[in-house]
């Protein structure tokens, strides 16, 4: 007869009318009983012949791809001008006095952040924007391109101008100013009727131009002239020390050469102003040029700047038609849906490319991307705005993966010990937190995103994947991309983007100037940054508890009035550092804080209501006696595992599911096991804050017997059959808890101390979790354990009772720096463990 739910509860000793614990509990460690129960509950029968179920409620399993939904009405979020102050350490020190070594180290890590993987795979530009929405390809292309443009304008991205130069918007940092052009010297030389450009800019690392002027350039370094050198100092080489110039045969056009206006510009201003002046010069120089893409013989996409035959060419003569978009202007419409109709809507489509306010030199950057991008909803609650997803997963996969640094995240018990108090709470919203942290320009070649331009994108998606060579093709080739779909999409997009359609149809390569969300290093850097800032805030405002996890920052104070005044001061302090807060999203929680998916109050911690609701819905839709695909089980365990610490039996109750996931088999829920889990998750118990105290109850065991020391009394007992030592120690701890009711027990067994009961026999693990719930353990060495003698059957011998103090654990999260640590005379090493003591105790 199958095991009923009531019998199963009695078996697990979850009901009060069970027999004496010393007899009942060791029985649960019996292998035979565990096997019989598993068979009764159908837990071990993983090989099933019935087809697997691949969907349970919202959880999808194998062979199902969740198709993201494209929203044609997506708005691109606006980004404030985020500029984290470079002298953040000095500013903090002015505010709070000298910083600890730990805080300084963390803040130096992000000023600027560095990211240099061993190996970077470069992907063709076609893979820049992922074809996630084939039905809305063109719309997705322009929305993504607009998002990237917005990020560039906000100073979050660099734009690759040439192989060795990039431009950006926003305020430059000192490490960027060192790389700016000190001086710009243009010289035009005319010989043998061959007019060519000879650019001698000290910042843009263009390849040597073509023509007779090359000879004079051979003496120059690849890096160009330095600001302090003479305006035409020929013989000296620059920083690189190597004199290498690539000479192109005169017949070929030069790629990536910086174009110059006629005449000579010699600007001796400071680097910043020269940089601004230069960008203005570059704009005029570029205004009559157009950039396009062309497939070179090696199949690489190369930027081609078509230089007009005369440098003094008047701008009124119109653009040179190498631009795919503008070529339609001079062509006859091929049909009613020809793009010519759209191009003729406007007289002035604006420039082909835009250039940033500042220019810097960068390491050699190919015309490639290292990760694809696509758009999704900003979050489940906000589907009107889009979010850019950047896929830099190449750095986390395969043989070339980078192992990211580990950092301390408080576990549930530590979090409860830290934050469970009768304080009043509010949480701050840091807007675009990742985009606060600047990246060194040398990391740019590893973090490239971009697009190959509209024609290539459309050609790749069209059924006849023609290799469009629109540089030397006929006009007919140009019209190959005309189609009704493209025409209708562009007409609708014209209402949104206007003349920007032209700009966005061009290829572009962008590198990250601030840390991207998709980089494996980013969470670590963000955690270091916010935890250092909170540490400074706690010292500056001793009566305030500031705590952060990633971009979630919470402030706690004794009263609401106190909290409000602290909020004003702290907000001003953070704004002075350049940290952008979103005042509309500041949440005031009262006395129960919502943080990291938990509700934390003076009574302890529970999961948030929406998670409890999700679990209830999940059980409602969970089928019985039907094999469920292990991928669905994995998602199920993710949800149930989050709330497991709040149930009677905890994680051990989920062990059968873990086993099925590990063996990649289907799992069949029997009615009893489902009812058991259902009841477990319907009644959730808070995880309470641990209290410090003196330990006066000790437990110890040998494979054959157990012993307890409760105050001055001693007890002992024997097992019917010898047991593994860890099992025996766990049983002894359970007996100590049940007999004394103490919440503090001393043990010499590390497994019992760790409170992870998933490796024990299943039934015993479940029962022990319930008996020992809310118990804290203190380690006592075997030699000093007063329960050691009784466990060996010696009751007459009394070891002195130890007074073992217990301090609640806060993991590696230090909440308060009591004093500045004395500098040691040892060589400075980077520590990740916090040397600070936790002096703050929750009230």
Curated annotation (Swiss-Prot):
Residues binding Mg(2+), per UniProt: 429, 551-552
The keyword Hydrolase belongs to this UniProt entry's keyword annotation: yes
Catalyzed reactions: DNA(n) + a 2'-deoxyribonucleoside 5'-triphosphate = DNA(n+1) + diphosphate; Endonucleolytic cleavage to 5'-phosphomonoester
Activity regulation information from UniProt: Activated by host HSP70 and HSP40 in vitro to be able to bind the epsilon loop of the pgRNA. Because deletion of the RNase H region renders the protein partly chaperone-independent, the chaperones may be needed indirectly to relieve occlusion of the RNA-binding site by this domain. Inhibited by several reverse-transcriptase inhibitors: Lamivudine, Adefovir and Entecavir.
Region (Terminal protein domain (TP)): 1-177
Residue span of region Spacer: 178-346
Biased composition (Polar residues): 268-277, 287-299
Domain of life: Viruses
SUPFAM superfamilies: DNA/RNA polymerases
Disordered as annotated region, ranges: 224-243, 253-316
BP terms from Gene Ontology: DNA replication; symbiont-mediated suppression of host innate immune response
Keywords of the record: DNA replication, DNA-binding, DNA-directed DNA polymerase, Endonuclease, Host-virus interaction, Hydrolase, Inhibition of host innate immune response by virus, Inhibition of host RLR pathway by virus, Magnesium, Metal-binding, Multifunctional enzyme, Nuclease, Nucleotidyltransferase, RNA-directed DNA polymerase, Transferase, Viral immunoevasion
Pfam families, per the entry: DNA_pol_viral_C, DNA_pol_viral_N, RVT_1
A GO molecular function held by the record: RNA-DNA hybrid ribonuclease activity
The family this protein is said to belong to: Belongs to the hepadnaviridae P protein family.
PANTHER family recorded: PEPTIDASE A2 DOMAIN-CONTAINING PROTEIN-RELATED, POL PROTEIN
Domain notes: Terminal protein domain (TP) is hepadnavirus-specific. Spacer domain is highly variable and separates the TP and RT domains. Polymerase/reverse-transcriptase domain (RT) and ribonuclease H domain (RH) are similar to retrovirus reverse transcriptase/RNase H. The polymerase/reverse transcriptase (RT) and ribonuclease H (RH) domains are structured in five subdomains: finger, palm, thumb, connection and RNase H. Within the palm subdomain, the 'primer grip' region is thought to be involved in the positioning of the primer terminus for accommodating the incoming nucleotide. The RH domain stabilizes the association of RT with primer-template.
Comment field (misc): Hepadnaviral virions contain probably just one P protein molecule per particle.
Name the record gives this protein: Protein P
Species of the source: Hepatitis B virus genotype C subtype adr (strain Japan/adr4/1983) (HBV-C)
